[in-house]
Swiss-Prot record:
NCBIfam families membership: hemE
Lineage, opening ranks: Bacteria, Pseudomonadati, Pseudomonadota, Alphaproteobacteria, Rickettsiales
Gene3D superfamilies: 3.20.20.210
Metabolic or biological pathway, per its Swiss-Prot or TrEMBL entry: Porphyrin-containing compound metabolism; protoporphyrin-IX biosynthesis; coproporphyrinogen-III from 5-aminolevulinate: step 4/4
Purpose of the protein: Catalyzes the decarboxylation of four acetate groups of uroporphyrinogen-III to yield coproporphyrinogen-III.
InterPro entries found in the cross-reference section: UROD/MetE-like_sf, Uroporphyrinogen_deCO2ase_HemE, Uroporphyrinogen_deCOase
Keyword Cell cycle: no
Binding site for substrate: 21-25, 71, 146, 201, 316
Name by which UniProt lists this protein: Uroporphyrinogen decarboxylase
UniProt-listed PANTHER family: METHYLTETRAHYDROFOLATE:HOMOCYSTEINE METHYLTRANSFERASE RELATED, UROPORPHYRINOGEN DECARBOXYLASE
UniProt site (Transition state stabilizer): 71
Provenance organism: Rickettsia massiliae (strain Mtu5)
GO terms under biological process: protoporphyrinogen IX biosynthetic process
Enzyme Commission identifier(s): 4.1.1.37
Protein family according to the UniProt entry: Belongs to the uroporphyrinogen decarboxylase family.
């Protein structure tokens, strides 16, 4: 049985564990492969290299799931939008400003996404059983935000101003991204992934009305469309920073697994685990500290979620400066806790 799917099958004894950005710059073996290709997107589309780095954390740590090495911005890039990644800066995109800009978006994707599906098929062949394989996409609001801003920001004033002032155009762009995202996830499932995930990194910048319109509604459309074709494929959603709106999200979006950030109280995670499987939520910065602190913080989460529908993960991605030995210690600690399953002597 696929390890990460155990909670869906009622197996409470297993604590599935994997980490966002588990294949990345904190791994020396990743850096060695990454430095062979200058352009980041070219690296994402290189079938052999992307397969290799997807499998690296599985070989090193034995996580219960591998997540395809890719990026949320391959989607707009595949539809003709200008996307580039600058060293030490991050993504730089052509800025979407008006109706005229739709002419730069193609109706059908180029062959770039086919490379992603080839990577999935190759990883699937090489992935040790019973490790799960996760495919993913950026949620429409987050992808749309990058297009409206032209790069990553913290306040997203440009994006929010745009949706306030250009409701019809914003809805048109949102619908385009929503449709293409659903298709991309369906094609990943067809290629062999076991689980799908939607990353909404910037959902936390929206007020309730806009959160409903730009996060909840498009995510719901995507989930329903995917479930029409793959009703048994679990879907994880991560509306990062949603705060109190996580509850509204759970009520209105028919997901299987809710990923939460480190700001969510453990009591809320316990409460929500009666409705969905909850994934999270160790602060990634904890992995920059020492073993005692890692043990203390991890134990609190494991104790709170003991016997619950739960997947252990971080509240966001592994930081590039994270010591590999700390990731190893954390993984072994979760395994040991699972084995002993005791709140008295452990």
């Amino acid at each position: 049985m696929k390890q990460i799917i155990n909670p869906l099958k009622g197996n409470d004894n297993k604590i599935p564990i994997w980490f966002m950005r588990q294949a990345g710059r904190y791994l020396p073996e990743y850096k060695k492969v990454r430095e062979t290709t200058k352009n980041f997107l070219d690296f994402c589309y290189d079938v052999n290299k992307a397969t290799e780095v997807t499998l690296q954390p599985i070989k090193r740590y034995g996580f219960d799931a591998a997540i395809i090495f890719s990026d949320i911005l391959v989607l707009p890039h595949a539809f003709g939008w200008e996307v580039d990644f600058k060293e030490n800066i991050g993504p730089i995109l052509k800025q979407f400003k008006s109706q005229e800009d739709f002419k730069y978006l193609q109706i059908n994707p180029n062959d770039k996404l086919e490379k992603v599906y080839e990577i999935i098929k190759k990883v699937k062949k090489e992935l040790p059983s019973p490790t799960s394989l996760i495919g993913f996409a950026g949620s429409p609001w987050t992808v749309m935000s990058y297009m409206l801003e032209g790069k990553g920001k913290q306040d997203f004033k440009t994006s929010k101003k745009f949706i306030y002032e250009n409701k019809i155009l914003a809805e048109e762009l949102l619908n385009f991204i929503t449709e293409k995202t659903a298709d991309h996830l369906i094609n990943q499932a067809k290629s062999g992934v076991d689980v799908l995930k939607l990353f909404d990194s910037w959902s936390g910048v929206l007020a309730e009305e806009e959160f409903t319109e730009f996060v909840i509604e498009p995510t719901k459309k995507i989930v329903l469309k995917v479930k029409e074709v793959f009703p048994k494929t679990p879907i994880i959603a991560f509306p990062k920073g949603a705060g109190l709106l996580y509850e509204k999200f759970i009520k209105e979006v028919p997901i299987d697994i809710l990923a939460v950030d480190q700001m969510v109280p453990l009591e809320k995670m316990k409460e929500w685990s009666d409705k969905v499987i909850v994934q999270g939520n160790l602060d990634p910065v904890v992995l920059l500290t020492n073993k005692e602190i890692i043990k203390e913080k991890t134990y609190k989460i494991l104790q709170a979620m003991k016997g619950k529908n739960f997947i252990f993960n971080l509240g966001h991605g592994i930081l590039p400066e994270t010591p590999t030995e700390n990731v190893e210690f954390l993984t072994e600690y979760v395994r040991l806790y699972e084995e002993k399953n005791s709140n008295s002597t452990f």
